[in-house]
């Protein structure tokens, strides 16, 4: 694969204070301080975080649609689509299962809930009833049927990632099958990609404001002190996720010829955004763009990233088995090996419906415990207060897992420019887009 060289010299480095990751860090620190010292006012800033996430969700559907359609329509052989999808699902299934097992093993070794001796009958279940009610709406058949939208337009109106993915794949295949007659449509969609991604860049400038509001609300409402009683569970989850990313995914990255630490550094701005908003979905458009810049083919990025947001949730899977066994230990429920295998199997299925939105992990945990009656659902009240703090770690782990999956599947498919990947991870790749000249410097375009 040929690497095109920039037409001119690279622009001067952007000062650190103008870089997104620095601005997000400052916003998170200021938001945390405000939440601690002025909790009442900080709680009122929740709309800032919510508004930013809504802005990002607004652009996700067009980004996914354009990336997938132009990628598939540009493929020489349509068999490639099925092959990439099959490889992606194989990867997702293996590592999702591994994450569930890791969470279960850590729960047995660390025993975070041992000695609490909680009586489930004495717990206030009213706080978790909302989540349990939502979890009853989750089922495998319902999840699969929900992938098919009521109309082509409703997929975009509802912003359902899997529905948009479904429509985009079908439209991309149809566009490829009509051949030259579809060339004008493909050219239009490729031209439309530029302003859509420019809009993504514009929205990302509001990331510090969104992160500030979200973290201020979190600290103001729940307080840092709410972590103390369940610090052992929270600490176990963070350390387990760190182990999964640095060791397990680190080994995978090393076998594929790159460093997971360099990948994390490459995605630092997006990771800080995910940290501030507790939603991996907030950085989805940027992740897709950066994976293309890192040498992954557009068609692979368009299929792997959106699919991974529902099927490759490593952080959520670790959380589900760890939290379920914590509740079992805290309520003195001794699970047999068969019951634990059942728990793992149910968690595997229920986790597939959890998209990268805040609170999805807690809902899928409720779905799992509702199906496995051995662990009391009322025990979820024990972790409700600290679940919001574990949400950040879930989202970060999910995000990194999907970035690694994109590179691995691209390499597996021989659709990875390794030289470009090295340049990007070393910080030597050209910027995502060239600076836009002022209006008076734009030359008129002659008609062709």
UniProtKB/Swiss-Prot annotation:
Subcellular locations according to the entry: Cell inner membrane
Keyword Coiled coil: no
Keyword set, alphabetical order: Cell inner membrane, Cell membrane, Membrane, Symport, Transmembrane, Transmembrane helix, Transport
Ranges of Pro residues composition bias in the record: 432-441
GO molecular function terms attached to this record: fumarate transmembrane transporter activity; malate:proton symporter activity; succinate transmembrane transporter activity
UniProt keyword annotation of Membrane present: yes
Annotated spans, Disordered: 428-448
GO BP, one annotated term: L-aspartate transmembrane transport
InterPro entries: C4_dicarb_transport, Na-dicarboxylate_symporter, Na-dicarboxylate_symporter_CS, Na:dicarbo_symporter_sf
Main location per the UniProt record: membrane
Coiled-coil residues: none
Transmembrane feature ranges: 20-42, 51-73, 88-110, 138-157, 161-178, 198-220, 230-252
Membrane-topology annotation of the record: Multi-pass membrane protein
Function noted in UniProt: Responsible for the transport of dicarboxylates such as succinate, fumarate, and malate from the periplasm across the membrane.
NCBIfam families: PRK01663.1, PRK13027.1
Similarity comment text for this entry: Belongs to the dicarboxylate/amino acid:cation symporter (DAACS) (TC 2.A.23) family.
Protein name: C4-dicarboxylate transport protein
Organism the protein comes from: Xanthomonas campestris pv. campestris (strain ATCC 33913 / DSM 3586 / NCPPB 528 / LMG 568 / P 25)
């Amino acid at each position: 694969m040929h690497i095109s060289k920039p037409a001119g010299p690279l622009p001067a480095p952007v000062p650190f204070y103008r870089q997104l990751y620095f601005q997000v860090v400052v916003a998170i620190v200021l938001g945390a301080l405000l939440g601690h010292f002025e909790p009442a006012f900080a709680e009122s800033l929740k709309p800032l975080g919510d508004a930013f996430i809504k802005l990002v969700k607004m652009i996700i559907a067009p980004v996914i649609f354009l990336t997938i359609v132009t990628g598939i329509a540009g493929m020489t052989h349509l068999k490639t689509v099925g092959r990439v999808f099959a490889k992606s699902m194989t990867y997702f299934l293996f590592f999702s299962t591994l994450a569930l097992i890791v969470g279960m093993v850590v729960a047995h070794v660390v025993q975070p809930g041992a000695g609490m001796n909680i009586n489930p009958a004495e717990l206030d279940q009213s706080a978790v009833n909302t989540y349990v009610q939502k979890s009853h709406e989750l089922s495998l058949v319902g999840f699969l049927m929900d992938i098919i939208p009521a109309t082509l337009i409703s997929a975009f109106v509802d912003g359902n990632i899997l529905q948009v993915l479904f429509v985009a794949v079908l439209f991309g295949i149809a566009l490829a099958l009509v051949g030259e007659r579809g060339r004008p449509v493909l050219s239009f969609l490729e031209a439309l990609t530029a302003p859509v991604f420019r809009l993504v860049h514009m929205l990302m400038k509001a990331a510090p404001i969104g992160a500030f509001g979200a973290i201020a609300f979190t600290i103001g409402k729940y307080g840092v002190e709410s972590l103390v009683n369940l610090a052992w569970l929270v600490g176990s989850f963070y350390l387990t996720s760190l182990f999964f990313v640095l060791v397990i995914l680190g080994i995978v990255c090393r076998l594929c010829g790159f460093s997971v630490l360099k990948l994390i550094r490459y995605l630092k701005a997006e990771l800080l955004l995910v940290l501030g908003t507790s939603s991996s979905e907030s950085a989805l458009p940027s992740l897709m763009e950066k994976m293309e810049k890192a040498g992954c083919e557009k068609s692979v990025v368009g299929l792997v990233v959106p699919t991974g947001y529902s099927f490759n949730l490593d952080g959520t899977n670790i959380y589900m088995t760890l939290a379920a066994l914590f509740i079992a230990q805290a309520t003195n429920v001794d699970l047999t090996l068969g019951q634990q295998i059942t728990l793992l199997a149910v968690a595997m299925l229920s986790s597939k419906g959890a998209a990268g939105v805040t609170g999805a992990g807690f809902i899928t945990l409720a779905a799992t415990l509702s199906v496995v009656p051995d662990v009391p659902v009322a025990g979820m009240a024990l972790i409700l207060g600290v679940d919001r703090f574990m949400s950040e770690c879930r989202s970060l782990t999910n995000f990194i897992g999907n970035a690694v999956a994109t590179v691995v599947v691209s390499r597996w498919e021989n659709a990875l420019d390794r030289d470009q990947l090295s340049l990007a991870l070393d910080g030597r790749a050209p910027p995502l887009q060239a600076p836009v000249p002022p209006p008076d410097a734009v030359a008129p375009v002659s008609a062709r």
